[in-house]
Amino acid sequence: SLIDAFKVIDTARGNTTLTYFEFATLAAFYIFSKQNLDFALLEVGLGGRLDATNIIDSDLSIITSIGIDHTEFLGSTIDSIANEKAGVMRPFCYSIFAGANPPATLLSTAQSNNISFIFGHNHFSHNIYNNYWKWRGMHGTQLKLPLMPLTGDFQYNHASAALQAIEI
């Protein structure tokens, strides 16, 4: 149970101070470790490079978007924020950017670390029609899907990136 996991983390941390997010993340990882999981899908809380979830070596990462937010933690430019988010990318693994125009920082991080970098409208794409949307993956998979009840084209970008991760 979650309470048992919190007790284990509290004992293991000793005198180390943890934020609530770090504490809860470690408790979740403890619970995951006791399960027979085929995979785990983790969402970074803030940024990437210094996020508590980043202690896990992932096989694949998805960066949904990069915008000017959380500037007090991530920096005030797209480049500085992209650098923080690039911290989730791993050498010799896949990294997916949901948008069509990845910042140069992501491209250079991928190139210098042997990361298979995939991004929207170059490697995978989607089209929205009146009653459905279509997705095309980098390996030729095509899907006709019902429209989502969520508004905004970015929702389709994010869903497309998730489908690309599944296709890989």
Name each model-derived stretch.
Residues 1, 58, 154-157:
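A generic short alpha-helical patch detector that favors 3-5-residue windows
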Residues 21, 95-99, 151:
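Glycine- and other small-residue-rich loops at beta-strand/loop junctions that grip anionic moieties
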